[in-house]
């Protein structure tokens, strides 16, 4: 096993760095800017049962220390992803592990999309985006209620034959009960954290800077929050954790590992710097040398036991 190699729920990744869902879409555009085969894995855009047009523009805005986005789950739908997007990745990058991100507005939609996503041979893990509003319960996000998280996780796990990672929302009073609810439902791992709900207002127009009003805050501003939440959850579970939130440098990666992560995703850093993922991968060995880390597996053993 190499210095950077990690294992997530039985799936081997040659390094721990992958773009967060949405930042690489389905890989085709990012492939024009960097060698996707250098990535540890690729998380595709959150996909729903039917195509979604997304929210009206503007959908993104830069803030003091990050980005606000309200894309609205814009995607071509699972049937297109199975027929076009995933086969393209399988043809051009046959050895690249794909993490299929699943979204939905109901239990039935989540299960149906997860079942289809899991049927793709190059999808090795499923990541379930539970920040979506539950249309059957007044629009409350699925990921804010422990009982709902357990029930949804159970339903998806029962329907698929691939490991299921639940992507946790930080927009809760305490994220630990949500993580434990996912574990109780049979999750193979956790991805954390999703964006924090934020807002910006244009002083000249007196209107929100995003057409949707609110949006998800990502970037350097949320990194300390992600570190704290990963640390808190790690005290209560042995499940593998994919850490996400303000990762810009190799040092950020190692900080997540010290908090209890097993792998990382890079989101906002790619907006102004498309090669952020591969640059971080290239810089990891030197950062590990600087801090006396022989391998990531050894660091996981040191931190997690």
Swiss-Prot record:
Entries under Gene3D superfamilies matching the protein: Aldolase class I
Record-listed FMN binding positions: 21, 45-46, 129, 167, 193, 219, 245-246
Primary localization class, coarse: cytoplasm
Cofactor notes: Binds 1 FMN per subunit.
UniProt binding sites for substrate: 45, 69-73, 129, 194-195
Source organism, top-level taxon: Bacteria
Active-site residues annotated for this sequence: 132
Cofactor dependence: FMN
EC identifiers of the protein: 1.3.98.1
Quaternary structure annotation from Swiss-Prot or TrEMBL: Homodimer.
Protein role: Catalyzes the conversion of dihydroorotate to orotate with fumarate as the electron acceptor.
Protein name as catalogued: Dihydroorotate dehydrogenase A (fumarate)
Gene behind the chain: pyrD
């Amino acid at each position: 096993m190499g210095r950077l190699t990690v294992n997530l729920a039985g799936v081997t990744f040659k390094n721990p760095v992958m773009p967060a869902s949405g930042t690489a879409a389905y890989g085709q555009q990012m492939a024009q800017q960097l060698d996707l085969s250098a990535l540890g894995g690729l998380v595709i855009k959150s996909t729903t049962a039917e195509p979604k047009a997304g929210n009206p523009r503007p959908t993104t805005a830069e803030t003091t220390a990050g980005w606000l986005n309200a894309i609205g789950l814009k995607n071509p739908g699972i049937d297109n992803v199975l027929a076009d997007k995933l086969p393209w990745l399988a043809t051009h990058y046959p050895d690249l592990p794909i993490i299929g991100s699943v979204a939905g507005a109901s239990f039935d939609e989540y299960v149906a999309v997860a079942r289809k996503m899991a049927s793709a041979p190059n999808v090795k893990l499923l990541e379930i985006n539970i920040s979506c509003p539950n249309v059957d319960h007044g629009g409350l996000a699925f990921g804010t209620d422990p009982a709902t998280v357990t029930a949804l996780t159970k339903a998806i796990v029962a329907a698929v034959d691939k490991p299921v990672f639940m992507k946790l929302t930080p927009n809760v009073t305490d994220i630990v009960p949500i993580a434990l609810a996912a574990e109780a439902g049979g999750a193979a791992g956790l991805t954390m954290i999703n964006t924090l709900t934020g807002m910006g207002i244009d002083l000249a127009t007196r209107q929100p800077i995003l057409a949707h009003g609110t949006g998800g805050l990502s970037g350097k501003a949320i990194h300390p929050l992600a570190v704290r939440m990963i640390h808190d959850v790690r005290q209560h579970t042995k499940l593998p954790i994919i850490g996400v939130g303000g990762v810009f440098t190799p040092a950020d990666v190692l900080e997540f590992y010290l908090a209890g992560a097993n792998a990382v995703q890079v989101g906002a850093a790619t907006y102004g710097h498309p090669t952020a993922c591969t640059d971080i991968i290239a810089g990891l060995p030197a950062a590990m040398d600087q801090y006396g880390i022989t391998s990531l597996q050894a660091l996981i053993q040191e931190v997690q036991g």
